[in-house]
């Protein structure tokens, strides 16, 4: 069984743990840097990206997270987690983890009161996934090797690049665990490649 960490500094941690377990993997809430060595994949949960960055800096997680990304182990960022994974953020001089060749606009769908749900078609997942968007970012631009898995209107809301997956929406806030299960499969495949 693969072990998937959920960065436990801030955000929808419990909901991700429940979704990982429902997808047949072991979930570990990561609150200490050394726990990164014990896991096969990592989820960066949605929350408030500025607060999350402050906590990542406070607990010296940034370099270990960048090292984890360089190791080739899969990472999945939802909402604020997508912002953390992006190489370019509109209106900001530097990236956070910067593992994905994507450009992201923060709070692009509006403020908290503009939050909404939308039916999405997600490549490799299904036609009828309900995406929960809360002050959501979206992907403005992608490198050639980034696969766009889903759009809402003309906006890219789910993307994949190598071992990295990012979504504007919160798949953990529904009882539909297919997006998490998709990530669990990515982690299983990556672990098998390391064994071979």
Swiss-Prot record:
Pathway per its UniProt entry is: Cofactor biosynthesis; pyridoxal 5'-phosphate biosynthesis
Which SUPFAM superfamilies does the entry mention?
Class I glutamine amidotransferase-like
Q: Where do the catalytic residues lie?
A: 79, 170, 172
| Gene Ontology biological process | glutamine catabolic process; pyridoxal phosphate biosynthetic process; pyridoxine metabolic process
Superkingdom in the source lineage = Bacteria
For this protein, the Enzyme Commission number is 4.3.3.6, 3.5.1.2
Q: Name one Pfam family in it.
A: SNO
Gene Ontology cellular component annotations, sorted alphabetically: cytosol; glutaminase complex
Q: Does the keyword Hydrolase apply?
A: yes
The answer to whether the entry has keyword Hydrolase is yes
**What are the protein's GO molecular function terms?**
glutaminase activity; pyridoxal 5'-phosphate synthase (glutamine hydrolysing) activity
Task: Read off the InterPro entries from this record.
Answer: Class_I_gatase-like, PdxT/SNO, PdxT/SNO_CS
Q: Tell me the residue numbers annotated for binding L-glutamine.
A: 47-49, 106, 134-135
Q: Which reaction does it catalyse?
A: aldehydo-D-ribose 5-phosphate + D-glyceraldehyde 3-phosphate + L-glutamine = pyridoxal 5'-phosphate + L-glutamate + phosphate + 3 H2O + H(+); L-glutamine + H2O = L-glutamate + NH4(+)
Q: Which UniProt keywords apply?
A: Glutamine amidotransferase, Hydrolase, Lyase, Pyridoxal phosphate
Subunit info here reads: In the presence of PdxS, forms a dodecamer of heterodimers. Only shows activity in the heterodimer.
Q: What does this protein do?
A: Catalyzes the hydrolysis of glutamine to glutamate and ammonia as part of the biosynthesis of pyridoxal 5'-phosphate. The resulting ammonia molecule is channeled to the active site of PdxS.
Record-stated family: Belongs to the glutaminase PdxT/SNO family.
PANTHER family on file: PYRIDOXAL 5'-PHOSPHATE SYNTHASE SUBUNIT SNO, PYRIDOXAL 5'-PHOSPHATE SYNTHASE SUBUNIT SNO1-RELATED
> What name goes with this protein?
Pyridoxal 5'-phosphate synthase subunit PdxT
